[in-house]
């Protein structure tokens, strides 16, 4: 029996050649849990570079009031 390695997810930002942006808060909501926490790389499928940049942009959107800090 041959066991194949699972296919790697391709980072959507690398694929589309763009960067995460705090002004696109509707898209950033996809990377938050129901409680408002930032999802990890395994769940988002992003590369390390874009995961770090995504976290910075989510925090920036929170400071501007575009995203909630905590969802109750």
From Swiss-Prot:
One record GO biological process: translation
Record gene name: rpsR
This protein's UniProt keywords: Ribonucleoprotein, Ribosomal protein, RNA-binding, rRNA-binding
Subunit structure: Part of the 30S ribosomal subunit. Forms a tight heterodimer with protein bS6.
Similarity-based family: Belongs to the bacterial ribosomal protein bS18 family.
Known function: Binds as a heterodimer with protein bS6 to the central domain of the 16S rRNA, where it helps stabilize the platform of the 30S subunit.
SUPFAM superfamilies in the cross-refs: Ribosomal protein S18
Keyword Ribosomal protein: yes
Membrane-spanning intervals of the chain: none
Pfam assignment, any one: Ribosomal_S18
SS bonds (residue pairs): none
Name of the protein described by the UniProt record: Small ribosomal subunit protein bS18
NCBIfam families xrefs: S18 (TIGR00165)
């Amino acid at each position: 029996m041959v066991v194949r390695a699972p296919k790697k997810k391709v980072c959507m930002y690398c694929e589309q050649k763009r960067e995460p942006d705090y002004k696109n808060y509707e898209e950033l909501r996809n990377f938050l849990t129901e409680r408002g926490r930032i999802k990890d790389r395994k769940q988002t499928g992003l590369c390390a570079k874009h995961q770090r940049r995504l976290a910075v942009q989510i925090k920036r959107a929170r400071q501007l009031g575009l995203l909630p800090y905590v969802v109750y």
